[in-house]
UniProtKB/Swiss-Prot annotation:
Amino-acid positions noted as binding 5-methyltetrahydropteroyltri-L-glutamate in the UniProt annotation, renumbered to this chain: R18, E19, W20, K21, K112, W550, E594
Active site: H683
HAMAP family associated with the record: Meth_synth
Species in which this protein is naturally found: Staphylococcus aureus (strain Mu3 / ATCC 700698)
Binding site for Zn(2+): H630, C632, E654, C715
Pathway the protein takes part in: Amino-acid biosynthesis; L-methionine biosynthesis via de novo pathway; L-methionine from L-homocysteine (MetE route): step 1/1
Pfam family, one: Meth_synt_2
Keywords, ordered alphabetically: Amino-acid biosynthesis, Metal-binding, Methionine biosynthesis, Methyltransferase, Repeat, Transferase, Zinc
UniProt gene name: metE
Biological process (GO), any one: methylation
Protein name: 5-methyltetrahydropteroyltriglutamate--homocysteine methyltransferase
Enzyme class: transferase
Length: 742
């Protein structure tokens, strides 16, 4: 009988209580030394490695741990340093500056990692001299060995790394070939150090364009075969189906496939005989992207099917566990829902249960997990009826008519200015919210504090000269979690944090039941803010697509049904704001693009459903009420027509890190709705210059009608310091005032 082995593709960096984030931000704030930072992160890395060892994994990943982002780590490994940062020592401070920017230079672009809510730092190839320059991967592998951990190194593969890069004059194929000797050098150093195999992540090979990469992929891995290292390589794919017959023809030692998010195709390919049995199959059978406990009995059935077509089988999560929280141990959850959950640590336990059952005929842990899953499934979370048909899915009048009524009502100037919604969440703001949640202060004391903070920032905005104001969202910890706390059908955990980008962590709510609006969510704060000024104050909501994409979704209903349930709830809040006299309502959809399926065959239906849900949430208002939306971090070319179909009166889009590349997407579409392209990067502490903002405006106006153009930062300002925000917005408004005089 074949012995089943277990492995993992990656583990969360954050720590159970965000120790990683706190240490890094303390270092940035100069509250701890570099030595203290290094010690804290070393301790956390050790904890991660030993935890995985506790669950008897046969091989544990190293190289997944990072000080910021594993793609940026790979850039530094190969000396792919942005030209503006070249000439410096390659160390952690350089890494942080590339990721965050500094007073002299803008940060590198930040892009979604495939269709997840993780973001990577885009490698830049302009005038680089690739070489192996900082082999942190080797250092971390040796550290794992010192702990007696059976580890395997993890590195993003050459095809994926280059495809996710930008800049330079070489072709895609030329860049790959440039890197091959460097990958070889790194592989050899790891093998010489004792690596039994090396995990080479090539998720780009599950995308639509993967067939066009097959020639260069074959050339790359043939090169590694000639170098004598290919048999030590395991190509890991995840998030979708792969072209198994092609991958099986490559001269590597093993292949990793996703058997959760592949829509059943990978198993069909296995059963069709497309897998080369001389290789080891690394089967991603435990969902690495969602928090629900596995149907462990179904996983055993899947393993039995795979065993009929493989000689060596390793079971693993479907992807890195980076995308889920660390552990349920610190949560105090209602048993009715808690029994159905599985975070990163619990997923390792599921793998261990299957290993024990299949290798040792030890069913104790398996039987326990099976009974727990069955208890959860026997509950009913489908209790509500919905009347989707009675709610409008289109505005009363076309945009050309609406905008006339809106302009009469709002009386906005040429090139109106606004912000995206949130203002800095100072330590005081966070402390008051924590004290209120933990019942250390009264509701009245907390409400008084919020009103004072709202009033202070309304005055700041008026003094700066912004045209459309916001209340600042000081009552919100997160733009999705806030709504998860207030809508029926959501569960919000205490420590369910996941990394979004850099030190930015989010705590996605868990959708476990039918979603319903039961009371106003944002009306009080917005109405109070509006009472303080004659300028319009935007109501600020998160849209249904983003709430779904940034939550851990239930899997017992189709996505569209859950999305439309959320849309009806947001529609109720939109109407409540309108009834309270709010003239401008923003329904943010920053995650619309990121949820786009990796395979184009699913795009049309996804976008159709997304547009319908947004319109379900926003179309019931009167013509004179102006609907805004916001999107960020996205490559919009594929969805530009869907963005237009949303029929939002104004859309603001993050573009600053892409240096205006997005504007090209408007060349093939006559975009005739209001639009603001972000004119400066809020993810960096750097204050933009008046000239930079003017240049961004001028470039935008080459493609966009001036009468439709708004000027705004590229995203919310929650993570910035107060003085940074004031200074940057002052520069923005002054640049616009000068532009109005032209």
């Amino acid at each position: 009988m074949t012995t089943i082995k277990t492995s993992n593709l990656g583990f969360p960096r954050l720590g159970r209580k965000r120790e990683w984030k706190k240490a890094i931000e303390s270092y940035w704030a100069k509250k701890i030394s570099k030595e203290e930072l290094d010690q804290t992160l070393t301790d956390l890395h050790k904890e991660n490695l030993l935890l995985q060892k506790y669950y008897h994994l046969d091989s544990i990943p190293v190289g997944d741990f990072s000080l910021y982002d594993h793609i940026l780590d790979t850039s530094l490994l190969f000396n792919i340093i942005p030209e503006r940062f070249q000439g410096r020592t390659i160390d952690d401070d350089l890494l942080f500056d590339i990721a965050r920017g500094n007073k002299d230079h803008v940060a590198s672009a930040l892009i979604k990692w495939f269709n997840t809510n993780y973001h990577y730092i885009v490698p830049e190839w302009d005038n680089v001299e690739p070489k192996v320059s900082r082999n942190v991967l080797l250092d971390r592998f040796k550290y794992a060995q010192s702990l007696n951990v059976n580890a395997h190194p993890v590195i993003v593969g050459p095809i994926t790394f280059v495809k996710l890069s930008k800049g330079g004059h070489q072709t895609f194929e030329e860049k790959v070939k440039t890197l091959l000797p460097l990958y070889k050098e790194v592989f050899e150093s790891l093998i010489d150090a004792g690596a039994e195999y090396i995990q080479v992540d090539e998720p780009i090979l599950v995308t639509d364009d993967s067939e066009s990469y097959e020639n260069i992929t074959r050339e790359a891995y043939d090169y590694f075969e000639k170098a004598g290292v290919a048999k030590k390589l395991v190509i890991q794919t995840y998030f979708e189906r792969a072209h198994l017959k092609f991958l099986s023809s490559l001269p590597v030692g093993g292949l990793g496939l996703d058997f959760v998010h592949d829509n059943g195709y990978n198993l069909k390919q296995i059963e069709a005989g497309d897998f080369d049995k001389s290789k080891t199959l690394y089967a991603g059978i435990i969902d690495g992207r969602n928090v629900w406990a596995s149907d462990i009995e179904a996983k055993k059935v899947l393993i039995d099917k795979l065993l009929a077509h493989t000689n060596e089988l390793v079971i693993q999560p479907s992807s890195s566990l980076l995308h889920v929280p660390v552990s349920l141990d610190d949560e105090t959850l209602d048993t009715s829902v808690g029994e159905g959950l599985s975070f990163a640590t619990e997923k390792l336990d599921e793998l261990d249960a299957l290993r024990r059952l299949l290798n040792q005929n030890d069913s104790v842990k398996y039987d326990k997990l099976k009974a727990r899953y069955e208890r959860f499934q026997n509950q009913s979370f489908k209790n509500l009826d919905y009347d989707f048909e009675s709610v409008r899915t289109s505005r009363q009048s076309p945009f050309a008519q609406r905008i006339e009524q809106q302009q009469k009502r709002l009386n906005l100037p040429d090139l109106p200015t606004t912000t995206i919604g949130s203002f800095p969440q100072s330590r005081e703001v966070r402390k008051y919210r924590a004290d209120w949640k933990n019942k250390r202060i009264t509701d009245e004391a907390y409400e008084t504090f919020l009103k004072n903070e709202i009033a202070r920032w309304i005055k700041i905005q008026e003094d700066i000269g912004l045209d459309v104001l916001v209340h600042g969202e000081f009552e919100r910890n997160d733009m999705v979690e806030f709504f998860g706390e207030k809508l029926q059908g959501f569960l919000v955990t205490k420590f369910g944090w996941v990394q979004s980008y850099g030190s930015r962590a989010v705590k996605p709510p868990i959708i476990y039941g039918d979603v319903k609006w039961t009371a106003p969510l944002t009306v009080d704060e917005t109405v109070y803010a509006q009472s303080l000024t004659d300028k319009p104050v935007k109501g600020m909501l998160t849209g249904p697509v983003t709430i779904l994409n940034w939550s851990f979704e239930r899997v017992d209903l189709p996505r569209k049904v859950v999305q439309d349930q959320i849309a009806l709830a947001i529609n109720e809040e939109v109407l409540a704001l309108e009834a309270a006299g709010i003239k401008v309502i923003q329904v943010d959809e920053p995650a619309l693009r990121e949820g786009l399926p990796l395979r184009s065959e699913y795009h049309e239906q996804y976008l159709k459903d997304a547009v319908l849900s947004f319109k379900l949430a926003t179309s019931s208002v009167r013509d004179e009420t102006q609907i805004h939306t916001h999107m960020c971090y996205s490559q919009f070319g594929q969805i530009i027509h869907a963005i237009h179909d949303l029929d939002a009166d104004v859309i603001s889009i993050e573009t600053s890190r892409s240096h205006g590349d997005l504007i090209k997407d408007f060349e093939d579409i006559n975009y005739d709705l209001g639009i603001g392209l972000g004119v400066y990067d809020i993810h960096s502490p750097r204050i933009p210059t008046k000239e930079e903002i003017t240049t961004a405006i001028n470039r935008s106006l080459q493609q966009i009608d001036r009468s439709l153009f708004w000027v705004n930062p590229d995203c919310g300002l929650k993570t910035r310091k107060e003085e940074e925000v004031k200074d940057a917005l002052t520069v923005l408004v002054n640049a616009v005032k000068a532009k109005r005089q032209e």
